[in-house]
Structure formats: structure tokens, C-alpha cells
């Protein structure tokens, strides 16, 4: 005979059964370290790991998951790994790598993970943001139409850079690439542009010297220095560029202008090649992995000028009517001037122009050693100030004609008057384009120098006196025309009154003969 249960007994029975159930959730977010070598850790059993996820190892050590294989995960360790052993427990965190961002990083030197390394204590209030982010889409971008003044006559006149542009600085070692980048940072002192300098694979002494120079020139207050020195692991050198980009994007997203320098992407590509080979990925051309183009394209595409709508949407209406920009100056080091190597050609094709620095020009004393013939800025022309755009057209033509004629003049015994004048003008333009390091030049002074050479005022000045003449001219101009200088620097306009003032001022100064 079947036992009958009343409702109260049934509910009691169910409660008892529930209490007896032992919940033993299958742990799929833990794995076991099977090998540790050369900064690479292999982990068995992390079935739920995601690409680029942070993996927690013993002693608060983290690794970045890069290879997701059928039964194991290959990850690069961020930091020291001497304490890790085979059999250690590894856990997924569900987070991708993030770094601190915010205004409290300005004036500080941090490592690739955003930790301060300058001995000035902890960072102030910060937020965190992921190091990898999709670049702004086409709809959110605006055309480049505002200038970034480098302070170099040769660059601002012939190869202008705009806010939101990617302009490559390329050349052999010891041709002044870093010097040009640092001078550009110093020139942003009073422009409101925040700067991020990412040092990849450089000597610690070199980085310390750069930081000291920025401090001496009052430029560190608007700059974040991200340092991944040559003594640090390949993983940190690889990540540092993305970390710096994230710090720069913080300002772009909030309707401000930022400038980022990657010094240099050749060393980042070498670090990534090292990681890829250790992870046993198949090598391609020059032993680089197949995705080395994507390595740089996804980084440089994050530099952009974004619209007012983008900024308003990102800040949820807090910032209105402001565009933001992130301008990138990547640096590439070539070997014996070979710009057709794998990484240089990749980055040339990604960027909006390039500044070629040549060893021969550098050794000849022409510094910055810019080769005006093959340097180009594809979008910067629309961002030039009116006055420089109006005056600089003749500079490139004069230099091009001079280089062409100089080659023939070596074989010609006697030259006609026109050719001789073009050669002499070219010599003076070449001399005028020389500039010492840490001597940034304002728009007004650049315009005055270019006007003087274009109108022939330097034709009777000896070539070796051109720079002395220019220095005296600027000093005289600042003493007598302070209001006009401020007007030109603020507006960048060009009109007949300014031309008349330039003409009168140069003629007055020439009569003094005080150079």
C-alpha cells in the first residue's frame, strides 16, 4: 500500500533534500603552470581565458594571455618571474590590462604599467582605462585644420604638422630624431597641448637626461613620460606604447589636445618579435610575425581629431562644443638609410607623412638634418597658419632648385648670372634652416626670417653671417614690435600692414650693420 504524504510533510522533505545538497561548482578559472622560461609562462587548464586577459600568478604577479591553444595558454609575464615554479596555480581575472589615466600623471615618470618610478611618491587621484581600445570610427572624426608648432623653421614651413595627424620621424641612429621630438614637446609650453613621451627600449641614463632637459625648459609640467627601458622585459616594452596612447586618449576624449611621441617603434617591433618567437608563432619576413603591421596600425589609428559630438557623447554632456585631438609622432630608426625595410615601409604606409633625417646632412652641420626633397606632410598643409603658408611656398622651391643646380654646378666652369643667384639664394636658405637644439622659434620670428630670405634681404649677407644676422634681427624686432609679435603669434594672420612692418623693420635693421 502506497504511503500518502500531506502537503506539510512534502515541503519538509524538500527543505531537507535542499539542505543536503552540496554545491561544488566546477572551477574552470584556475590552471597549473607547466613551464616558465624567458618571460613566457605556459598554463594548463585555463579553459575560460580570453585573448589579452590578465592572469594572476603567485605573489601578485600578472601575465598577459596571448596564445590560446587547445589545452594550454601561453602568456607573457609582466615583471619579475624568478619566484614562479612549475605547478604554481594561475587564475583568470576576467579583466584586460588597464593603466591609470588622468591629470595627476602630468609631470611624472611612470613605467609601462603606469606605476611611478620618479621617486616623487604615489600618483594623485586617477581613473583606469584599458590599454587596448578600438580607434574612433570615421563618423566621429574631423579633418585636421589646426597646427602643432614644432618650433623648427624647416618643419613648420615645409612639413607642417596638424592636430590629430600621424607624422613619422625616420632616420639612422644619431641623426637628431629624439632631439626633434623633445623640442616639439618643449614648444607646446604655452599652447595647452598635453604631451606623452613613450621611451621604448632606451638606456635609463638617456631617459633621465631627457627628463632633466624637460624640467630645465619648464616642459615637464605638461608632459607624461612613460619609460620602458632596455633592461625591462620585452613584454613591458611591447605594452608601453599602448599604455602611453591610453594616457593621451584621456585628454582627447575630454575635448583637449594631446601629443604623443613613440621613441621608437623599431624597438617595439623587435620586442614583439621576441615575444612571438618565444611563443612559437611562425616567423615571416625578417623573422617578424605575420601581424606586425597590425601591431602598429591599431596603435597609430588611435591618433585622431574627434568631433564635438564624440566629446559630448563620451563626457555625457559635460563638455560641449569642443573637439579633441591626439597627434602622434612615431619614430623609426633605419639601418644605413634603408627605408625599404619591413617595419619602416609599414609605418610609412600607416602615417600621414614623414620627416626624413639624413646622416650626410647631419655630419655636414645642417641640423635639423631634414631632407626636404623626400619629406612630406600629407594633411598638415591645411593646418598651417596663414602667415607661414603664405610665406613658405618659396622656401621649398628655392631648396629644390638649389639642390638640382648644385649637382650640375660641380661640373660647370662658368655659370650665368641667373644660375649663380639661384645657387647663392639656395645656400642662404639652407643656412637659415639650421637651428640649434632647445631654441624653439615663435611663429612671428619664423615668418620674419622666411620673409627676409624670400625677398632677397639676405642675398648680400655672407653665408657664415646669416644666422648671426637672423639672431640680431629677431632681437631688434622684439624690442620694437612687441605688440605685432603677439598679434601674429595669436592669430597667425597675414596682411599688407604686417608686410609693410616687416619690410620697414628689416630695412632699418640692415642700416645699423650690428650683426
Curated annotation (Swiss-Prot):
Q: Which residues bind ATP?
A: 171-178
Matches recorded under CDD domains: ATP-synt_F1_alpha_C, ATP-synt_F1_alpha_N, F1-ATPase_alpha_CD
Q: Which residues of this protein are annotated with the site description Required for activity?
A: 375
Bilayer topology:
Peripheral membrane protein
Transport is among the record's keywords: yes
Q: Which molecular function terms from Gene Ontology are attached? A: ADP binding; ATP binding; proton-transporting ATP synthase activity, rotational mechanism
Check the record and name the Gene3D superfamilies matching this protein. Answer: 2.40.30.20, ATP synthase alpha/beta chain, C-terminal domain, P-loop containing nucleotide triphosphate hydrolases
InterPro entries to which the protein is assigned, alphabetical: ATP_synth_asu-like_sf, ATP_synth_asu_C, ATP_synth_asu_C_sf, ATP_synth_F1_a_nt-bd_dom, ATP_synth_F1_asu, ATPase_a/bsu_AS, ATPase_F1/V1/A1_a/bsu_N, ATPase_F1/V1/A1_a/bsu_N_sf
The compartments listed are: Cell inner membrane
Q: What is its EC number?
A: 7.1.2.2
Instruction: Report the principal subcellular site.
Output: membrane
- Entry GO terms, CC: plasma membrane; proton-transporting ATP synthase complex
Pfam families per the UniProt record, alphabetical: ATP-synt_ab, ATP-synt_ab_C, ATP-synt_ab_N
Record keywords: ATP synthesis, ATP-binding, Cell inner membrane, Cell membrane, CF(1), Hydrogen ion transport, Ion transport, Membrane, Nucleotide-binding, Translocase, Transport
Which regions form coiled coils? Answer: none
Q: Which reaction does it catalyse?
A: ATP + H2O + 4 H(+)(in) = ADP + phosphate + 5 H(+)(out)
Main role? Produces ATP from ADP in the presence of a proton gradient across the membrane. The alpha chain is a regulatory subunit.
Subunit text:
F-type ATPases have 2 components, CF(1) - the catalytic core - and CF(0) - the membrane proton channel. CF(1) has five subunits: alpha(3), beta(3), gamma(1), delta(1), epsilon(1). CF(0) has three main subunits: a(1), b(2) and c(9-12). The alpha and beta chains form an alternating ring which encloses part of the gamma chain. CF(1) is attached to CF(0) by a central stalk formed by the gamma and epsilon chains, while a peripheral stalk is formed by the delta and b chains.
Spell out the family assignment given in the record's similarity comment: Belongs to the ATPase alpha/beta chains family.
Q: What is this protein called?
A: ATP synthase subunit alpha
Q: Which organism is it from?
A: Xylella fastidiosa (strain M12)
Q: Which gene encodes it?
A: atpA
